[in-house]
Amino acid sequence: MEQSLGSLLTPHYKNVLAKTMTATGERYRDIVKREITAEVKRAWCEYLSALALCRLWQGEEQTAKRLREMSVLRYEQGDISKLEYSMMNTLAAEQHTKRVQAQDQLTVAAKRFAWVCRSTEPVVPEDTLLSLLPATLCEQPSATYLTYFDMQARQKQDMVNIEKSKFFPEFSIGYSLQKIAPLTNLSSWSVGVSFPLLFFPQKSRVKQAKMEALSAQFEAEENRTQLRRKVEELRDKLSMNAKNVAYYVDAALHEADELQRNAVLLYEESETDIAELVQSLNTSRDIRKQYIDAVHEYNVTAVELELYSE
């Protein structure tokens, strides 16, 4: 039985490679934790958005039902035509359909949120108010990702050192047990040293390892550049989304509420027709829906920025 020990430097560099691989695995574990956290927050944002849309369509359906009941009385009294009466029925039916679709989307979002939370039962949050997630305009990419990229390149460099160490003499140790009659249990130990006579095969392996290490360095640098660029883009996008949300909060939402309230009031007083009423209601609803979408876009961007920066 003979066991090769390799060169004196090979075990050392293999140990260095093992430590590097362990550190790389730890960084990858940290990345997975961050991505799981981000995925839960994305699902939470999607749930809040779906819930807000469901509430929006519920309110629109209630308004349409009230206006439809009013239209029935006005049609029976001869104040509106059959065409206007049909338009109001169509509006009520459309709002009901939208509300049902929003409810289905909310159910899907709730199931997805429970799934990413690894829960077998529905997760019912206490606070379901649509709001902006706390976010900071981080300047630096996440050190977890940067370290992971460096560790990947370092593994290839460790492989270069291992291949270089094979230029040195390799040691081996052997043991044998023989039985030569009439003698038994004849044990012997052997120690061997081997020197490479031709270096060309090993030079080729070293050259290949160097090329792989250089490629890994280029890839790591490209990943770092892409990460910095992504963080910068997310930071700019978050700032833009914040301004968009501020526009709705400061002015547009108030105008939408006033538009709907005045349109319903004018219709109740018979000072506007159904066509103008429907147009005003649609405009008001679209503004509130755009606000919900703007908040959702802001929150998703904030989650992405938190994931890739610090």
Residue ranges and their predicted role:
Residues 154, 185-189:
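Residues that define the transmembrane beta-barrel architecture of outer-membrane proteins
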Residues 16, 27-29, 35-144, 234-237, ...:
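Periplasmic alpha-helical coiled-coil/stalk elements that build and connect Gram-negative outer-membrane
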Residues 169-179:
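Transmembrane beta-strand segments that form the barrel wall of outer-membrane beta-barrel proteins
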Residues 94-119, 255-310:
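Short segments within alpha-helical structural elements
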Residues 31-34, 77-79, 165, 180, ...:
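Short coil/turn linkers that connect adjacent helices within long alpha-helical scaffolds
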Residues 1-16, 27-34, 38, 52, ...:
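A glycine-/polar-enriched beta->alpha junction
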Residues 208-211, 215-247:
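C-terminal structural cap/anchor segments
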